[in-house]
Swiss-Prot record:
Domain notes: A DNA-binding domain overlapping a bipartite nuclear localization signal is present in the N-terminal region of the protein and is required for efficient virus formation.
Molecular function GO terms recorded: structural molecule activity
Organism: B-lymphotropic polyomavirus
Phosphothreonine: residues carrying this PTM: T339
SUPFAM superfamilies, per the entry: Group I dsDNA viruses (SSF88648)
Protein name: Major capsid protein VP1
A Gene Ontology cellular-component term: T=7 icosahedral viral capsid
GO biological process terms on file: endocytosis involved in viral entry into host cell; virion attachment to host cell
Region (C-terminal arm): 303-368
Sections of the chain in a coiled coil: none
Lineage, highest ranks first: Viruses, Monodnaviria, Shotokuvirae, Cossaviricota, Papovaviricetes
Major localisation: virion
Family indicated by similarity: Belongs to the polyomaviruses coat protein VP1 family.
Length: 368
């Protein structure tokens, strides 16, 4: 009888495939989920959307998402646009959970925006050619679709978006209901470094007056595109598979100061032409999916400054006579440091020059 073959241990043992590691979902839900305390390596995703602010900004209005009919000036001197004809920026603030209980450490945790998925929602609604409006050919044809000038912009940051003012016509008079450049002059038709603002109000900053400031916004990432023309067809893409990385060349994303995330956008799809050939702006909402992580950073707030701000906040606010500025009533301030020999002239004029050297001004002779 032939000897039996030896069984090799483990030769026929099957191994189960190992799944690829992916982030483990801890919890999901509404904004109340942000109150859940998570570990230092936790990643948070926030989904939000911003509605357009074209002029009719109340959801119950019939023209919600549109502006009113654009009123065109007969001359530069009579350029007075109405508030409900001015597309404005949309903005929102999302309050994030407090990360630090002890602010006296040399390092603290801050929320860092890492990436964002975003897209304009409702592009398919522009296919509508039966809602009423100017006919393409005749009464038996469809109406002219939304077309013309388009503007798309969004921003994600740890601070409000910083704006630079620049207008097409400095003689335009904007209504008080919106934020415009104060005391506009011809220089505002170019870059005036004094025309600055913070995007701190929703639906108040007209797109035609303000744009993101390229010299600022170190803690914000913004993106935009513009297509001009009277009959230019709108061209927009939509997908849920494109991620925009918010990290800079140093691998750092926007750090959310005060544990707040700022979202802003403006999406003008074009103009709709009515039967009477008046035109209204059409805006669309934008969806955001922002990924945040916790980042260890050096504490920028010294304990001494925190204590000073705390104690100064305990003092009552007094409205007194001016002690600072142009009308300040402080006559003189003297600072003494260390000791010196008794000077023979107590009225010597002393100062520290730009090289940090102590200088003494010699007295002027009274001899004529």
């Amino acid at each position: 009888m032939a000897p039996q073959r030896k069984r090799q241990d483990g030769a026929c043992k099957k191994t189960c495939p190992i799944p690829a590691p992916v982030p483990r979902l801890l919890v999901k839900g509404g904004v109340e989920v942000l109150e859940v305390r998570t570990g230092p390596d936790a990643i948070t995703q926030i989904e939000a959307y911003l509605n357009p602010r074209m002029g009719n900004n109340i959801p119950s209005e019939d023209l919600y998402g549109y502006s009113n009919s654009i009123n065109t000036a007969f001359s530069k001197a009579s350029d007075t646009p109405n508030k409900d004809t001015l597309p404005c920026y949309s903005v929102a603030v999302i309050k994030l959970p407090l990360l630090n209980e002890d602010m006296t450490c040399d390092t603290i945790l801050m929320w860092e925006a890492v990436s964002v998925k975003t897209e304009v929602v409702g592009i398919s609604s522009l296919v509508n050619l039966h809602q009423g409006g100017k006919y393409i050919y005749g009464s038996s044809s469809g109406c002219v679709p939304v077309q013309g000038t388009t503007y798309h912009m969004f921003a994600v940051g740890g601070e409000p978006l910083e704006l630079q003012g620049l207008v097409a016509s400095s003689t335009a008079t904007y209504p008080d209901d919106v934020v415009a450049i104060k005391n506009m002059k011809p220089g505002n038709q170019g870059l005036d470094p004094k025309a600055k603002a913070l995007l701190d109000k929703d639906g108040k900053y007209p797109v035609e007056v303000w744009c993101p400031d390229p010299s600022k916004n170190e803690n914000t990432r913004y993106y935009g595109s513009f297509t001009g023309g009277a009959t230019t067809p709108p061209v927009m893409q939509f997908t849920n598979s494109v991620t925009t990385v918010l990290l800079d060349e140093n691998g750092v994303g926007p750090l959310c100061k005060g544990d707040k995330l700022f979202l802003s956008c403006a999406d003008i799809a074009g103009v709709h032409t009515n039967y009477s050939e008046t035109q209204v702006w059409r805006g669309l909402p934008r969806y955001f999916n922002v990924t945040l992580r916790k980042r260890i950073v050096k504490n920028p707030y010294p304990v001494s400054s925190l204590l000073n701000s705390f104690f100064s906040g305990l003092m009552p606010q007094i409205q007194g006579q001016p002690m600072e500025g142009v009308s300040g009533q402080v006559e003189e301030v003297r600072i003494f440091e260390g000791t010196e020999g008794l000077p023979g002239d107590p009225d010597l004029n002393r100062y520290v020059d730009k090289f940090c050297q102590h200088q003494t001004v010699l007295p002027v002779s009274n001899d004529m």
